[in-house]
UniProtKB/Swiss-Prot annotation:
This is RNA-directed RNA polymerase VP1. Its EC number is 2.7.7.48. RNA-directed RNA polymerase that is involved in transcription and genome replication. Following infection, it catalyzes the synthesis of fully conservative plus strands. After core assembly, which consists in recruitment of one capped plus-strand for each genomic segments and polymerase complexes, the polymerase switches mode and catalyzes the synthesis of complementary minus-strands. It catalyses: RNA(n) + a ribonucleoside 5'-triphosphate = RNA(n+1) + diphosphate. The keyword Nucleotidyltransferase applies. It comes from Cryphonectria parasitica mycoreovirus 1 (strain 9B21). The keyword Transport does not apply.
Length: 1354
């Protein structure tokens, strides 16, 4: 049975054959390539380009069997002299690798079962080496036969089955199918010659045919005459009848990932070919196994590149560049022999040796580019998968670290038959010093004992509660039996496994009794799995709700303490370059940088480490400080006996136990921490399903899923940095525990300054000495400081993995190189993912998932122009979706591959499909049959994602009036500026522009019907009176049919076109969910609830309506509803959503501005006329054209032009993403940042008292409210619709705030009354067309307040 007869998402082979047999197809693809490239305009007066787009979209839906026919029509070609094999930033004269697929891939060996060993004692399968856990190269067809031959259950049979599951799980799709992913990569690919043109010249060839990797792909397909694997609901499958290597799917996705990155300028074509060749070489044994075995040699080669390059060093402070100097690193440079390459001799001689030989003459551009390019040799652009149960020693088992901490005395309490240590007296002087610092610093932290119950509930998330399968199965049966409706019962049962619902259920049971609570603290919980790119798989030790109470209390004192100490860094809070401030400042200054990673910090954390800090936390909650507050356990507000508990206490010192005469009375927060220490290492069960249904993990490892896991590590690292800094400041007189002599620290202690940052197990350290030191002496001083820090961590029992460099440092996966950002494009995986739960959903979801990653390439790539190409191709690839119906017209939910009965969930209206069929200029539908079912493949219009909602950059356009509109830039954001593009392209007006004020005034007056009115009055009137809706007829002035034909109308309906689970489930009415919601609201702070109701009522009297879900009084309800929204879509919901989609498609054919508020509001965008202006732009900083700024801002590039004009961000500016991260996400608040900002703006107009009531209504703290006020006052980000269109990851380097906009605003308009919204609109328009709008430090734009825009140059 062929694939096309089984699967919905393939169009019939006959359809593809017809296209491939068409002699015009090569020209169609070339025409399409020029459209997405921006070098050929789309003609809005013709439907031809829509047809071209549908042809290409159809090809992306071909089956595996048709790929050889496509490759035959478009064979790989050798580059001619005009198509040089290397990109414009490459300098390595590498020949293209000879195509040679290893015989081990074409004829793989049999599976090696002998490396797997069964331990009958633990019922666990293990391997002898940590690298053996990864999937080897073997013949999958043989493995399938071996599994089919298993007749009885046995350990050896389980090993065989587990190995097959390992193969099934080796790839999880991101959003697109393998074939769609391949076509996206091919059509996005630009050869190095065309990359350098940035869309300025029309292409005369299809670039992918000249790719060396495409030649490899063709060679991989040829022996099978198809792509011999596919991915369905069960995972990766091979086609029957073929001998396929287990590494084939990994190599396929690695190939298309590398092809995609060539167009972005991160690899040259020849180097990408060699890179893929190395992965072929490694795949002979196993991709992931050899990746870890061989990465050491690549690290050595990268060290050679960095140590021999001469770079520009950017010395800066808070993003103000103080100096730019040329500098050569003094890092140690390894010899070629020391690199110890283990790849084949062919690769060593023809690839690594030429790279090594040219490293003696590396300038700034070459050095930075090559170091990034070698990252693709270091790690595969794939998620590292494998049975986590085989890697328990790495993350699921405890390890001793460098030593066990010794204590001369302990204080213990007796809890339920067990003595628990709650305080220690360390033997080591240094560990004693850390304990003293912990006691001192935590005692300074203010602890609030009020509303602890409410605070703990508000901290609950909508993640999994970590319950075991057995617990969930019993709970599920109990809930389903209680409900007559199976659908409601299943929904509620699924919700019960979510943390916030689980907590509500337990508050009335186990949280009422100490004994039951303690039993649950030590109950088994579930272990999760994490798969990451370039890193080994990990076990996540989840923690039950009872145990989380103590973790939350510890977090409450640790977090404010280490934030006050000032050594922490918040990671990706803002999302742009300001998150990198520490690494940029450190790497831009002279001296040694130490990037430290604690090896296995979770696994190395002992009970004693937790007690070391936990004892200080118990003291911080001392009754003398906070009394005996109410907190569960049937406690009361009046501080009765239920608010405390007396525990027998003893002291052990020098082996002697000394019982205390008086037992100690502990309050409930102290007891909760003690109980957590009691159950800190309860068992966790890993359900990975590979070689056994479940595996018990270690009971000694520190749980990675505890609330305070990260804060425990951060607190400890901060205290070590504090001890080091204080000891240096005090003269460094008494080194600890046999530390080597630090003579330079002792000599220069008075002038040494430390930069230290810590978060979790990541640490950055750099020291600065007096200016009198020579560079060599400064290196020695900083080396001593870093060595002393590592020594202190070892005294605590942790082993450090460090990287020393005088020009480079890394922290939180962010790297600074000579004071400039050094990004990691190799860590963006576009086509595969960790979970695969968003694969092949609907066009909007698929587009958004992939588009977010492609935009991220703007901040990590040299040639950001190609992100435009990639996003436009993505628009085409995601423009189709299929409906599968039975002969009776009922939708079918599951595919044939699931081997489960079909779920027929709704009946489709034949009338709607007929209506769509009749509008062939708007939609295309291909009908075919699969296993007796009817398939309708629906194609959306060409530019369906080019709108202010999805934000795809518009291509070049010839408008209906004949104006030429250039293609938009990679810095296009989903804003009204895109609507401006559509209105310009479909406007029936023709206006002749003239630079003279008289002609301009006449044009304005004629349009607005305000003749003989002075120009300045027109400006003032239009700004004040919203002239747009009064003076235009949208139906008459714009070609609505063109808006519909090319996809604008469908696009702006995308949110309702493909409903999200939250939109669907918001309509569900369930009495049980309502009861849960009321109970959740009752768990909130009653005082704040009353204030919330009062504030909402007062604001309502001023016509300010606080949305229900944003009110603090209903925050519990919001959590319950959110837990319902995040569950997977059910079959019934799928049917309802699909019917909504069809209905909305039908509605889009009837929409007009006069009948649709959505369309009318979208079309009332601002108007921008492009005319020359003589106002010079004041540059905020020196030109970056000469030096560039790191890897992704080459000299004389679009990025350097914009950075010169816009400048680097201001470190103190407040961004939307920062608010969303620190306030909404970390604070576990419902709603979006946009909703809070819009509400604040509306309230602000009513006066300060209204803002005070808003604070009460939404339940914000003083700090949260200040953050919201800063966000709103930041002008540009204070405008809803602009704030959230801007993506900091897309404009990573550029300053984009109100002050900067105002600086340009004075140049953009002759009107003194220009509105803030107008400035925002101009900024977004400028970012869409930067090369058009900025010319020799002058702008080419002026604003007038009407409803359409002219962006075309005369």
């Amino acid at each position: 049975m062929s694939l096309t007869s089984r699967y919905t998402h393939f169009v019939p082979d006959s359809t593809i054959t017809e296209i491939l047999n068409d002699s015009n197809t090569p020209q169609i693809l070339l025409h399409y390539a020029n459209i997405v490239n921006g070098s050929t305009p789309v003609h809005f007066t013709s439907h031809h380009d829509n047809q071209v787009n549908w042809t290409v979209a159809t090809l992306t839906r071909m089956s595996q069997y048709m790929i050889p026919d496509f490759m035959k029509l478009f064979p790989p070609l050798e580059p001619t002299l005009s198509l040089q094999p290397d990109c414009h930033c490459s300098f390595i004269n590498l020949p293209r690798p000879e195509i040679k697929i290893p015989i081990e891939i074409l004829s793989p060996p049999k599976p090696n079962y002998a490396k797997y060993h069964y331990d009958a004692t633990t019922s666990r399968v293990f391997v002898n080496s940590k690298h053996e856990m990864y999937m080897d190269n073997f013949d999958v067809s043989q493995l399938i036969r071996d599994v089919a031959a298993i007749k009885t259950d046995s350990p050896s049979g389980n090993i065989t089955k587990g190995l097959l599951k390992t193969f099934h799980d080796s790839i999880k799709l991101r959003a697109l199918s393998p074939i769609m992913s391949m076509f996206h990569s091919l059509l996005s690919y630009r050869c190095p010659c065309c990359t350098s043109l940035n869309g300025m010249k029309k292409l005369n060839h299809l670039c992918f045919q000249y790719s060396s990797i495409y030649a490899f792909l063709c060679d991989m397909v040829r022996p099978y005459m198809c792509v011999p694997f596919f991915v369905d609901r069960l995972g990766v499958q091979i086609l029957p009848g073929f001998k396929v290597s287990s590494q084939y799917p990994l190599l396929f996705f690695e190939a298309i990932e590398l092809m995609h990155t060539v167009g972005l300028g991160n690899l040259s074509d020849s180097l990408s070919g060699w890179c893929f060749y190395t992965w072929l070489d490694r795949a002979r044994i196993g991709v992931f196994r050899e990746m870890f075995n061989r990465r050491g040699s690549i690290t050595m080669l990268k060290s050679r590149v960095v140590s021999t390059g001469t770079i520009f060093r950017f010395s800066q402070r808070e993003f103000v560049i103080e100096s730019i100097t040329e500098q050569r690193s003094t890092d140690i440079s390894p010899t070629f022999e020391e690199c110890s390459f283990s790849d084949s001799q062919y690769i060593q001689d023809n690839c690594y040796k030429p790279i090594y030989d040219i490293t003696t003459t590396l300038d700034d551009v070459k050095c930075r580019w090559l170091d990034v390019a070698l990252n693709y040799f270091y790690g595969a652009v794939l998620y590292v998968t494998g049975p986590v149960s085989l890697a328990l020693e790495q993350s699921g088992m405890g390890r001793p670290g460098s030593l066990n901490l010794q204590f001369g005395g302990t204080t213990d309490v007796y809890v339920e038959g067990r003595w628990i240590t709650i305080d220690v007296e360390p033997v080591s002087p240094f560990v004693s010093r850390i304990k003293q610092l912990a006691d001192r610093e935590l005692a300074k932290t203010k602890v609030n004992g009020d509303s602890l119950e409410h605070g703990f509930f508000e901290a609950q998330t909508t993640n999994s509660a970590g319950n075991t399968k057995e617990t969930l199965a019993g709970l599920r049966s109990e809930i389903i039996e209680q409900h007559d409706s199976p659908q409601e019962g299943r929904l509620l049962a699924s919700m019960a496994g979510i943390r916030v619902i689980d907590a509500m259920r337990r508050f009335n049971t186990t949280f009422r009794d100490h004994t039951e609570f303690l039993n649950e603290v030590r109950r088994p919980t579930k272990a999760g799995m994490r798969y990451q790119q370039q890193r080994r798989p990990r076990v996540i030790q989840m923690t039950g709700t009872e145990a989380q109470l103590g973790g939350w209390l510890l977090l409450n004192v640790y977090e404010p303490t280490y934030k006050r100490l000032g050594y922490t860094s918040s990671g990706k809070n803002i999302g742009d370059i300001r998150d990198m401030q520490a690494v940029l400042e450190a790497s831009g200054q002279n001296g040694i940088n130490s990037s430290v990673d604690i090896i296995g910090m979770d696994a190395s954390t002992q009970n004693t480490h937790v007690t070391l800090l936990g004892s200080a936390a118990i003291k911080a909650y001392n009754p003398e400080r906070i009394g005996f507050p109410k907190m569960f356990f049937q406690s009361t507000h009046n501080g009765g006996d239920a608010n405390s508990r007396v525990l027998p206490t003893r002291v052990t010192r020098d082996g002697q136990t000394i019982p205390k005469d008086d037992d100690v009375k502990y309050n409930l927060p102290q007891l909760a921490i003690i109980y957590s220490l009691h159950g800190m290492h309860g068992p966790t069960i890993l359900y990975d399903g590979y070689f056994a249904p479940a595996v018990l993990t270690s009971q000694t490892v520190f749980r990675s899923g505890w609330y305070n896991t990260s804060s425990q590590h951060t607190m400890l690292g901060s205290l070590v940095l504090l001890s080091l800094e204080e000891d240096i400041r005090n003269g460094y007189k008494n080194p600890y525990d046999g530390a080597p002599e630090r003579s330079l620290i002792a000599k220069h202690w008075h002038s040494i300054r430390i930069i230290g940052r810590v978060l979790g197990d990541d640490i950055l350290l750099k020291a600065f000495g007096p200016p009198t030191l020579t560079p060599d002496e400064l290196r020695e001083v900083t080396a001593e400081v870093c060595a002393e820090f590592e020594h202190r961590m070892e005294l605590l029992g942790f082993l450090c993995e460090r990287a020393f460099s005088d020009v480079m440092c890394e922290f939180l996966k962010q790297k600074g190189f000579g004071g400039a950002p050094h990004m990691f494009p190799d860590r963006l995986v576009l086509y595969t993912s960790e979970r695969g739960n968003q694969a092949m959903t609907n066009p909007t979801t698929m587009y958004r998932v992939c588009d977010a990653l492609i935009i991220e390439f703007n901040s990590r790539s040299r040639n950001i122009f190609n992100t435009c190409v990639s996003r436009r191709v993505l628009q085409t690839v995601c423009s189709t979706f299929a409906l599968r119906m039975t002969s009776s017209g009922h939708l079918v939910r599951r595919s044939y591959a699931s081997r489960k009965p079909y779920s027929r969930v709704a009946k489709v209206s034949d009338g709607i499909l007929s209506e769509l069929h009749n509008h062939k200029t708007v939609f295309r539908i291909i009908d075919y049959n699969v296993l007796g079912d009817h398939i309708a493949m629906i194609f959306l219009p060409m530019l369906w994602a080019t709108n202010h909602i999805l934000g795809c950059p518009p291509p070049a356009i010839v408008s209906i009036s004949g104006a030429n509109i250039p293609a938009a830039s990679p810095l296009t954001y989903p804003s009204a500026a895109i609507t401006t593009f559509w209105l310009t392209a479909t406007s029936r007006r023709k206006i002749d522009f003239d630079s003279s004020a008289t002609a301009y005034k006449k044009s304005m007056s004629d349009i607005s019907n305000l003749t003989a009115v002075p120009l300045d009055i027109i400006f003032s009137f239009s700004n004040a009176m919203e002239l747009s809706p009064l003076s235009i007829n949208l139906d008459k002035d714009y070609d609505i049919d063109t808006l519909r034909t090319f996809g604008f109308i469908v696009g702006i309906m995308s949110d309702s076109l493909f409903p999200t689970p939250s939109a669907t489930r918001a309509k569900i009415k369930s009495p049980v969910v309502d009861d849960w919601s009321r109970y959740a609201d009752s768990l909130l702070n009653p005082t704040r609830v009353r204030s919330s109701h009062h504030g909402s009522e007062i604001l309502a009297e001023s016509n300010v309506v606080v949305p229900y879900e944003l009110r603090y009084a209903h925050r519990g309800t919001a959590k319950v509803r959110q837990s319902m929204y995040e569950l997977p879509v059910t079959d019934l919901e799928y049917g309802e959503n699909t019917m909504t989609t069809l209905t909305q498609l039908s509605e889009s054919l009837k929409v007009k501005p006069g009948t649709s508020k959505l369309l009318r509001d979208a079309m009332l965008a601002g108007e921008v006329f492009v005319i020359p202006t003589t106002h010079p732009v004041t540059l905020p900083c020196p030109s970056f054209d000469a030096h560039g700024y790191g890897h992704i801002i080459p000299p004389n590039s679009l990025q350097s032009l914009l950075l010169t004009h816009l400048g680097l961000p201001v470190s103190s500016a407040s961004y939307t993403s920062s608010f969303a991260k620190t306030i909404l996400s970390d604070g576990k608040l419902p709603g979006s940042a946009e909703a809070y900002l819009s509400l604040y703006q509306e309230t602000y107009k009513k006066g300060p008292s209204a803002v005070a009531y808003l604070k009460d209504a939404i339940g914000f703290s003083d700090s949260s409210m200040s953050a919201l006020e800063r966000l709103a006052s930041n002008g540009l980000y204070g405008i809803s619709g602009a704030s959230f269109a801007y993506n900091p990851r897309g404009g990573f380097f550029f300053r984009f705030d109100q002050d900067n906009a105002d600086r340009f605003g004075t140049s953009l308009s002759p009107s003194p009354t220009i509105r803030r919204l107008d400035i925002v609109h101009m900024m977004f328009t400028m970012l869409m067309y930067p090369t058009t709008m900025v010319s020799q430090n002058q702008w080419m734009m002026v604003r007038f307040g009407r409803s359409f825009s002219r962006l075309a140059r005369r």
